[in-house]
Amino acid sequence: MMNPQRNKFVRFNGNDDEFSTKTTRPSVSSVMKTVRRSFEKGSEKIRTFKRPLSVHSNKNKENNKKKKILRVMNPNDSYLQSWNKIFLLLSVVALAFDPLFFYIPYVKPERFCLNLDKKLQTIACVFRTFIDAFYVVHMLFQFHTGFITPSSSGFGRGELNEKHKDIALRYLGSYFLIDLLSILPIPQVVVLAIVPRMRRPASLVAKELLKWVIFCQYVPRIARIYPLFKEVTRTSGLVTETAWAGAALNLFLYMLASHVFGSFWYLISIERKDRCWREACAKIQNCTHAYLYCSPTGEDNRLFLNGSCPLIDPEEITNSTVFNFGIFADALQSGVVESRDFPKKFFYCFWWGLRNLSALGQNLKTSAFEGEIIFAIVICISGLVLFALLIGNMQKYLQSTTVRVEEMRVKRRDAEQWMSHRMLPDDLRKRIRKYEQYKWQETKGVEEEALLSSLPKDLRKDIKRHLCLKLLKKVPWFQAMDDRLLDALCARLKTVLYTEKSYIVREGEPVEDMLFIMRGNLISTTTYGGRTGFFNSVDLVAGDFCGDLLTWALDPLSSQFPISSRTVQALTEVEGFLLSADDLKFVATQYRRLHSKQLRHMFRFYSVQWQTWAACFIQAAWKRHCRRKLSKALREEEGKLHNTLQNDDSGGNKLNLGAAIYASRFASHALRNLRANAAARNSRFPHMLTLLPQKPADPEFPMDET
């Protein structure tokens, strides 16, 4: 408080130059600071106009992040269905980790006392914590998974409720308590926190606590699997994609039950051993229970425990005073309770559980101990139920792999009975059997048309495009079409199969379909209405088509189906696409692109009818050309003969003799050519002009596209 007063006093003192100089500098700096502060305040005021927008944008970003974090998921989403499947498998696997805690106690063979395996308890705690982490994630998903309200599920999927409060209340009232009891880390707390701080023997406390803790948590874990299984089957329809995976899952469940019973058998064996020790220790003076649990101050117990708890086979016990270990004598005699080798005691106990579970506990010879009898009863009932489920599910899953083969066998049997009942000839029976076999090889018993008809229109269209588009473009006629026209054709094509020597269409029958060949070889023949001396054949391969309906489809006045002028027969197995006349008519009326001259010229080029007509037309023209050439040659020879005869009239006798010889040679040569040509003309091309096939119809439209 002294300095400010002094500064004020000095400010009014103008005589002291030295001091005044010292005081003026701070005043200038203070003025500069005030100016600087004013500029900063002004700039801050200018910035305040933009500050609310930035704050608002930051709030929007934070809200978007919260929305992303708190986003409600649809229970029918694919990723949530995948997570449910993964968590279901993890829940089943988690049931195999909890029994590992039962293997922690073991009998120390050096002192005949009960001890704990520190290494195994650490491993068991790590596995259990890892599985519990997935349970926590699943619980978080449950708080953010919507549900379908029952009132809106009358039609369709129903309305999804996305209110966080309703979702939380629904989950808290259903499976939250079961999930919470399942993830409580009670075994870890018992092993790592409670047991080391107990004043009582650690091995005794651990044995008693682990038995009840694991059993109490095993119940909610098993109870949670069934509703989760129902949820997976409701959303995705099935848990496993293949039959072998389903069979393996059921076999794993059976082996899991064997593992659980084997671990219980191991722990109860140690408990029976401990009870025998306690009874023996109670009969001896100065014997404390601390000696039985490897106390640091304990003594060697082998001197009196060997004689007090002998390991005698239950069938050989004749004295009631001898402790009867019953079904647990095998574990004590084999030495697995005294071993710290985990694989050794795990596989031995697992084999014991699998053997007795499969035998339904028939080989178990129990003592009079009530807990042992109840344990044997549970093994018997569980083995009966699990074995029945295993056989039933395995049979169901494995039969699903051969269901198509069985259906084919039933169809063949029905076909054989029908053919026998109708007394069909052998050739027809062979053709039917061959067709069924070929159809099975191509489709494997799947009815494609029925499968596609059950799908939505857009999905069916995309599938047809994927299956047919590449094959259609192999046909040259389709290569000039645009995508819209090809899509329309793909949506209406049907796959067909023909066996060897089967007829696709016969001459004189109405043409109802167009066949586009994808695989196989065919032959197309015609006799032009059965006229004598006319026969034409053409080989059809992949990329060709038969059944010329385009001209009929382009004619708006056409009503009846055209008559086929050719017979088409399959030389090998044929696979192709069939386009019905009605579908082609619909495409032709809806898509004017089909009326273009380019497509019609290409159609003529690849049409068998047009090719046949063109070949016959060329043959007729060539024959006319040959006749004209022959007649021209005859006229030239006649002219030469005429000139020779005229020269003979003006010449002498020698020339008359040469002319006569030349005339005779010309006459014989001409007659021979005429006879040969007439015979060939009558045998090979009788009345060529009259037998020329009729030109295929080519309707012209007033509005053609170029």
Curated annotation (Swiss-Prot):
SUPFAM superfamilies hit by this protein: cAMP-binding domain-like, Voltage-gated potassium channels
A molecular function GO annotation: cGMP binding
PROSITE patterns in the record: CNMP_BINDING_3 (PS50042)
Region annotation Calmodulin-binding: where it falls in the sequence: 591-606
Intrachain S-S bonds: none
Assigned GO CC terms: plasma membrane
Residue intervals of the IQ domain: 611-640
Entry binding sites for a nucleoside 3',5'-cyclic phosphate: 477-600
InterPro entries: cNMP-bd_dom, cNMP-bd_dom_sf, Ion_trans_dom, RmlC-like_jellyroll
Membrane topology: Multi-pass membrane protein
Highest taxon listed in the record's lineage: Eukaryota
Residues in compartment: Extracellular: 107-119, 196-208, 269-371
Chain segments annotated as transmembrane: 86-106, 120-140, 175-195, 209-229, 248-268, 372-392
Topological domain spans for side Cytoplasmic: 1-85, 141-174, 230-247, 393-706
Signal sequence, start to end: none
Alphabetical UniProt keywords: Calmodulin-binding, cAMP, cAMP-binding, Cell membrane, cGMP, cGMP-binding, Ion channel, Ion transport, Ligand-gated ion channel, Membrane, Nucleotide-binding, Transmembrane, Transmembrane helix, Transport
Cellular compartment(s): Cell membrane
Entry note about domains: The binding of calmodulin to the C-terminus might interfere with cyclic nucleotide binding and thus channel activation.
Biological role stated in the UniProt entry: Probable cyclic nucleotide-gated ion channel.
Family named by the database record: Belongs to the cyclic nucleotide-gated cation channel (TC 1.A.1.5) family.
Subunit structure: Homotetramer or heterotetramer.
Record protein name field: Probable cyclic nucleotide-gated ion channel 3
